C-alpha cells in the first residue's frame, strides 16, 4: 500500500438545469479535452430527447438507468501461493456509481446512431428498461463473481 495520505475528495457542484450532483459527474465523464460546454450540450440534449420520447421526467429515467447499470459485486485478483484467484468482493457506493457512469458512456459511444446525443439517449432508455450493452456489462460482472464464489473466503 502507498504510504501517502489519501487524495482529498473534490467538491462537485450540482448542475445548473436539474440541480443534481450525479448529472454533473456524468457530464464530467462525457467531457473530452476539458470541453465542458460540449459535454453539457450532449447530456442535456440526450435528456431532452428522452423527455420528448417517453413523456416522463428525464431525471427519473436517468436515475433508473444508472441504478440498473451499477454493479453490486465484482471480482478482484488475489495472489495466493503462486496461483491467482478471482475473488468476488462487494463494490463500495462511490465506485458503483463511477462504474455505472463509465459503462453507460462506453456503451453509448459504441452505438451506431448518428450523433452522441442520440446514442446517449438511446443507451439511457435501454438501460432504464434493463436492456443494452451497459446492462449486459453489469450482468457479465455479476456472472463472473457468481462463478468464482468458491474463492470468496480469500476476500480481504
Swiss-Prot record:
Cellular component terms per the entry's GO annotation = small ribosomal subunit
Listed under GO biological process in this entry are:
translation
Looking up Pfam families in the UniProt record yields: Ribosomal_S7
InterPro entries associated with the record:
Ribosomal_uS7, Ribosomal_uS7_bac/org-type, Ribosomal_uS7_CS, Ribosomal_uS7_dom, Ribosomal_uS7_dom_sf
Source taxon at top rank = Bacteria
Mind listing the GO molecular function terms for this protein?
A: rRNA binding; structural constituent of ribosome; tRNA binding
**This protein's UniProt keywords:** Ribonucleoprotein, Ribosomal protein, RNA-binding, rRNA-binding, tRNA-binding
Its function?
Answer: One of the primary rRNA binding proteins, it binds directly to 16S rRNA where it nucleates assembly of the head domain of the 30S subunit. Is located at the subunit interface close to the decoding center, probably blocks exit of the E-site tRNA.
- Give the multimer and partner information: Part of the 30S ribosomal subunit. Contacts proteins S9 and S11.
Family indicated by similarity: Belongs to the universal ribosomal protein uS7 family.
Name listed for the protein in its UniProt record:
Small ribosomal subunit protein uS7
Originating species:
Rhodopseudomonas palustris (strain BisB5)
Amino acid at each position: 500500500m502507498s504510504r501517502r495520505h489519501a487524495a482529498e475528495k473534490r467538491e462537485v457542484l450540482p448542475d445548473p438545469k436539474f440541480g443534481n450532483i450525479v448529472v454533473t459527474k456524468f457530464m464530467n465523464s462525457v467531457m473530452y479535452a476539458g470541453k465542458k460546454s460540449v459535454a453539457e450540450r450532449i447530456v442535456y440534449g440526450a435528456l431532452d430527447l428522452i423527455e420528448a420520447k417517453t413523456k416522463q421526467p428525464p431525471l427519473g429515467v436517468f436515475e433508473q438507468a444508472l441504478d440498473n447499470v451499477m454493479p453490486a459485486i465484482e471480482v478482484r485478483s488475489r495472489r495466493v501461493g503462486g496461483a491467482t484467484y478471482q475473488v468476488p468482493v462487494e463494490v463500495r457506493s462511490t465506485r458503483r456509481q463511477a462504474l455505472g457512469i463509465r459503462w453507460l458512456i462506453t456503451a453509448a459511444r459504441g452505438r451506431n446512431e448518428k450523433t452522441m446525443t442520440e446514442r446517449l439517449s438511446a443507451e439511457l432508455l435501454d438501460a432504464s428498461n434493463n436492456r443494452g450493452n451497459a446492462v449486459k456489462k453489469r450482468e457479465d460482472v455479476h456472472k463472473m463473481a457468481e462463478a468464482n464464489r468458491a474463492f470468496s473466503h480469500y476476500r480481504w
